[in-house]
């Protein structure tokens, strides 16, 4: 599952709302928050929000990648994680890539855009010798893991919050959901994602399986374990709240549609390959979305923010 955008805002209105929101957040938290645009004429993409620690020197820097459809402002409303990271001495960056909030995360365009923003941040703030961390929510977590697999500048540690990892599984489960929706309207997220996955993979799993192996951060059916072998020495945490009864009741979904299927399989294979620093953390009844605090296990809130930060700061 991924988070889908509910609406679109014009570029100028989005810029005004973003700056206003950041102003409110900066005053509420007493932290300096800056919005940086790589393209001054486009406020919807190729930009990043940066939250500064109160004092120097930094203890490192961290990229927190939003879920599908999320702006930096949405992230700051949903979770205190960026604020707490900055309070603990980490220069904190929330990027928006070339495709804007509709970034697919694991595709080459998103990964190239990530590298462009990373280079801009590291050069402006002289961070070459600093510890670097990366993580994200949903497809933002997929993006973080994909980056760690292929990057030249390796992060000291990676975290991901309920990310979809195996897009062959995602594609097949979405197709199955539509097939089972005989007397009900199909989930529009699945309808969209089937088309989007086919576009990004240049085909279906039957016609372009090699592309699914190449682009997915993890592939259950790839016996060669191509992608994850690059993570054998990488400290990695994946969070998930596998509330199967909620998914059955609220979404008519089962384990084949849940991201924890990918997450648990990937962690298991990494452990068997010798990575004892790869851990799956499961939670119960922690998933709630702000501002209305409604129940949803696929949420930022499943993470114990302070404990995650403590773990990151222990990494070398």
Language model: regions and residue ranges:
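Hydrolase active-site cap/lid region
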Residues: 109, 148-210
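Short amphipathic alpha-helix adjacent to the substrate-entry channel of hydrolases
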Residues: 74-93
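Glycine-rich nucleophile elbow surrounding the catalytic serine of serine-hydrolase chemistry
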Residues: 136-146
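C-terminal catalytic histidine-bearing segment of alpha/beta-hydrolase fold enzymes
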Residues: 104, 236-248, 257-316
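Short beta-strand element of the alpha/beta-hydrolase
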Residues: 58-68
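A domain-start/cap signature at the N-terminus of enzymes
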Residues: 29-60
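Alpha/beta-hydrolase fold nucleophile elbow
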Residues: 126-138
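Alpha/beta-hydrolase active-site loop
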Residues: 105-125
């Amino acid at each position: 599952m991924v988070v889908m955008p509910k609406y679109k805002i014009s570029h100028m209105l989005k810029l005004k709302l973003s700056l206003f929101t950041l102003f409110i957040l900066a005053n509420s938290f007493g932290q300096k928050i800056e919005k940086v645009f790589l393209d001054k004429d486009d406020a919807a993409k190729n930009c990043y929000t940066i939250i500064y620690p109160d004092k120097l020197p930094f203890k490192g820097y961290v990229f927190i990648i939003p879920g599908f459809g999320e702006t930096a402002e949405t992230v700051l409303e949903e979770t205190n994680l960026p604020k707490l990271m900055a309070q603990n001495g980490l220069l904190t960056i929330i990027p928006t890539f070339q495709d804007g909030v509709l970034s697919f995360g694991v595709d080459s365009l998103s990964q190239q855009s990530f590298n462009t923003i990373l280079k801009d941040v590291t050069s402006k703030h002289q961070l070459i010798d600093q510890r670097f961390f990366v993580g994200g929510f949903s497809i933002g977590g997929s993006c973080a893991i994909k980056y760690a697999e292929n990057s030249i500048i390796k992060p000291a540690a990676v975290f991901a919050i309920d990310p979809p990892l195996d897009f062959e599984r995602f594609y097949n489960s979405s197709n199955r959901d539509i097939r089972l929706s005989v007397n009900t309207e199909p989930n529009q997220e699945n309808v969209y994602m089937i088309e989007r996955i086919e576009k990004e993979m240049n085909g279906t799993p039957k016609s372009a399986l090699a592309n699914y192996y190449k682009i997915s951060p993890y592939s259950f059916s790839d016996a060669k374990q191509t992608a994850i072998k690059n993570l054998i020495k990488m400290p990695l945490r994946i969070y998930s709240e596998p509330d199967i009864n909620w998914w059955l009741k609220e979404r008519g979904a089962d384990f084949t549609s849940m991201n924890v299927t990918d997450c648990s399989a990937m962690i298991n294979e990494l452990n068997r390959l010798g990575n004892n620093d790869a851990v799956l953390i499961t939670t119960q009844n922690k998933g709630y979305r702000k501002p209305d605090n409604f129940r949803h296990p696929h949420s930022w809130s499943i993470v114990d923010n302070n404990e995650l930060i403590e773990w990151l700061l222990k990494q070398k």
